[in-house]
A protein has these predicted regions:
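Helix-loop element at the rim of GNAT/NAT acetyltransferase active sites that forms part
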Residues: 22-36
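Active-site rim helix/loop that mediates acceptor-substrate recognition in acyltransferases
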Residues: 36-55
Length: 165
C-alpha cells in the first residue's frame, strides 16, 4: 500500500444504499462513469439483485466510507475491476491501495486475466491502470440506455485495459 494509506474493503450491503446514492450523485465522482443509479430504492434493488460472481465492496479509510469498488468474475477465469472514490480522496494513494487489494482478491480467486474500463478523459485512472501493468486494448463507446431503450446522458467514449495475472 501507499505509505500511510491503509484502506479496507468490505462487502457491499443493502444498508449502504444511501452512501452509494450519495457517491453516484456526486458530480465530480461520477463524471467519468456511465449513468449511475441515484434513486435510493433502485439502488437497494440493484444491491439485492447482485449475483454471486459480482463482488462489490465498500472502500473504507479509517472506518470512513470513501468509495466503492468491484471485481466481477466471468466464467472463463477472467474478471473486470472498477472503482469510484469521493474526489477528496483522489491523489492520496487511495486508488492505488484499492487496485492492489482487488489484484490480491483476483489472485486468491485464481483469476487469470483482468480487464478495466475507464473514460478516455480520466487520465488519473489510465495512469493508475498503467502503473499496474494493464495494457490498453481498445477505445470504444458505452451507450447508456434507459429501461425504455432511450439513450441516457451517461453515454461516453471509454478505453478498455487488460492485465494477465
Amino acid at each position: 500500500m501507499e505509505q500511510g494509506i491503509e484502506i479496507k474493503l468490505r462487502p457491499l450491503t443493502v444498508n449502504d444504499a444511501d452512501f452509494m446514492v450519495a457517491l453516484a450523485s456526486n458530480p465530480d465522482a461520477a463524471k467519468y462513469l456511465p449513468a449511475m443509479i441515484t434513486d435510493r430504492q433502485m439502488m437497494k434493488d440493484w444491491i439485492k439483485g447482485l449475483e454471486p460472481k459480482e463482488h462489490e465492496y465498500i472502500v473504507l479509510l479509517d472506518d470512513t466510507k470513501i468509495g466503492e469498488c468491484s471485481l466481477v468474475v466471468s466464467t472463463d477465469h477472467s474478471a473486470e475491476i472498477g472503482f469510484i472514490l469521493f474526489p477528496e480522496y483522489w491523489g492520496r494513494g487511495c486508488g492505488t491501495a484499492v487496485v492492489r487489494q482487488l489484484l490480491e482478491k483476483a489472485r486468491q480467486m485464481s483469476i487469470g486475466e483482468l480487464t478495466a474500463k475507464t473514460n478516455v478523459n480520466n487520465t488519473a485512472a489510465i495512469q493508475l491502470l498503467t502503473k499496474f501493468d494493464f495494457q490498453k486494448q481498445y477505445i470504444g463507446w458505452i451507450l447508456a440506455l434507459a429501461d425504455d431503450g432511450n439513450e441516457l446522458s451517461g453515454s461516453q467514449t471509454i478505453a478498455q485495459f487488460k492485465k494477465t495475472m
